[in-house]
Curated annotation (Swiss-Prot):
One Gene Ontology term from the biological process aspect of the record: positive regulation of DNA-templated transcription
Main location: cytoplasm
Keywords for this protein: Activator, Cytoplasm, DNA-binding, Repeat, Rhamnose metabolism, Transcription, Transcription regulation
NCBIfam families the record matches: PRK13500.1, PRK13501.1, PRK13502.1
Name of the protein in its database record: HTH-type transcriptional activator RhaR
Biological source species: Salmonella typhimurium (strain LT2 / SGSC1412 / ATCC 700720)
DNA-binding stretch(es), residue numbering of this chain: 196-217, 244-267
One GO cellular component, as annotated: cytoplasm
């Protein structure tokens, strides 16, 4: 694409030897589609927004983790108090003898799965390492770059240890109710979600959980689930031959007319218009 925005190394790294640095987004504003001359890890701490990665939309909130390659196209829209950090790195500058391909999905041709989640325990450990990494990447002493790379190695190992698929929180996990709730919502794309049953199972207060969820994500539970379902519908409309009525069922809407109303309200166009526009841009 002739007018594609490309973020350049020289605008983020202090010199050609620096391999890793941290870019804070407190908050992350709307950002047009772009690629990079470097790779990045994206950690979401709070709030919510729409992250479109290689034309696939993701409704993101606390705990979302992305592995972004240099050539990937992504953008941020519909942001609401979205707080995240980008840990950016140049693969060719890394000198540490670490099996990076085993730690970082998509690293120099490794199998790529971009979207993961971290529970509260993993987030806390990652935040501690990122704070140290940010301090070193801003340092000027002779060993700052080496220390930053060591910490980057520690970070990617920490992320590998604690990350999990968005709909697959391990049964043995000691994560918080909020983490369990977000995983349960990810497993409810096709079927109704009963918050009262979830709270009964977890022996928690429904009112308190609703308050905690809104405080951390900036959305109600129903708003988040609706947004996740609409994002899934957008993906299916673009990448599957399913009929709109079939897509509505796969996204938890038993009535395709109601699905069309909600989809239009959230995206500004009907499902048919979205599919037509997406096919034109392919």
């Amino acid at each position: 694409m002739a007018n594609q925005l490309i973020l350049l190394k020289k605008d983020f790294f202090t010199d050609e030897q620096q391999a890793v640095t941290v870019a804070d987004r407190y908050p992350q504003d709307v950002f047009a589609e772009h690629t990079h001359e470097f790779c990045e890890l994206v950690m979401v701490w709070r709030g919510n927004g729409l992250h479109v990665l290689n034309e696939r939309p993701y409704r993101i909130t606390r705990g979302d983790l992305f592995y972004i390659r240099a050539e990937d196209k992504h953008s941020y829209t519909s942001v609401n108090d979205l707080v995240l950090q980008n840990i950016i790195y140049c693969p060719e500058r890394l000198k540490l003898n670490v099996n990076w391909q085993a730690m970082i999905p998509g690293f120099q041709g490794a199998q790529w799965h971009p979207h993961w989640r971290l529970g509260s325990m993993g987030m806390n450990q990652a935040r501690q390492v990122i704070n140290q990494l940010e301090h070193e990447s801003n340092g000027r002493d002779p060993l700052a770059n080496e220390m930053a790379e060591l910490l980057f190695g520690q970070l990617v190992m920490t992320l590998k240890r604690h990350r999990y698929a968005t709909d697959d929180l391990p049964a043995t996990s000691r994560e918080t109710l909020l983490d369990k709730l977000i995983t349960a919502l990810a497993n409810s794309l096709e079927c109704p979600f009963a918050l009262d049953a979830f709270c009964q199972q977890e022996q928690c207060s429904e009112r308190v959980l609703r308050q905690q969820f809104r405080a951390q994500t900036g959305m109600t539970i129903n708003q988040y689930l609706r947004q996740v379902r609409i994002c899934h519908a957008q993906y299916l409309l673009q990448h599957s031959p399913l009929m709109i009525s079939e897509i509505s069922m796969q996204c938890g809407f038993e009535d395709s007319n109601y699905f069309s109303v909600v989809f239009t309200r959230e995206t500004g166009m009907t499902p048919s218009q979205w599919r037509h526009l997406s096919n034109q841009s392919d």
